[in-house]
Amino acid sequence: MNKSFFVTGTDTEVGKTVASMAVMQAVSKAGYSVAGYKPVAAGSKETEQGPMNSDAIRLRECTTVEVSYTDVNPCLLHAACSPHIAAELENETVDFSLLTDGLKNLQARSEFTLVEGAGGWRVPVTYDTTLADWVVGEKLPVILVVGVKLGCLNHAYLTAEAIRRDGMEIVGWVANRVNPGTEHYGDIVKTLEHHLKVPKLGEIPYMPSIKSRDLSGYIDIAPLGL
């Protein structure tokens, strides 16, 4: 039996990977086998094993079953820009069937699969399609990550509205403090709790570096039915 969820954010650079790591670590501590999946990544760096995406590397590090890099990230685009632009620059096509095959592979090998998106909910993967179109097709429940900063309320409201308009369920959300100097942090979180009306899975404090950190204590996985 596998449970799978999709992690999206209110924008790029709001902490989707940090939140994904925290959820995966918490689920693993609860005794489940866990796999992380970054179906589409834009932006790579050279490693001894070839080009890789740093977010996908972190998800692989939190994965508790044996996987290759391409198992975690089947579609790697090298330019650090919107996936549809990167794909055009590199003469590539984001193939939804490839993404689905990769998801099924991980679902068959783990009890819990966490899929991390690229950018926000409406990030385009071609000029006519978005990654959300694939998520809707896969019927993946959504975890929303809010990067708590000035302006995040509008971003969170609009993102939640778009997800629900697409017929998808938001099962929980995570507050990630991306700016330690954000004023009225508590009031912002309180407002989000009131408006989103779904369980808050946790709050992640500002962290300059997350390498080798155990983030599981910041997340409550009970709302995920585990």
Feature-to-residue mapping (PLM):
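Conserved glycine(s) of the Walker
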Residues: 14-15
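N-terminal phosphate/diphosphate-binding loop that engages ATP/GTP or pyrophosphate donors
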Residues: 4, 18-93, 102-105
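Phosphate-binding/switch loop-helix module in NTP-utilizing enzymes
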Residues: 80-125, 132
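Inter-motif core of Ras-like GTPase G domains
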Residues: 126-149
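Short internal beta-strands
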Residues: 38, 143-146, 171-177
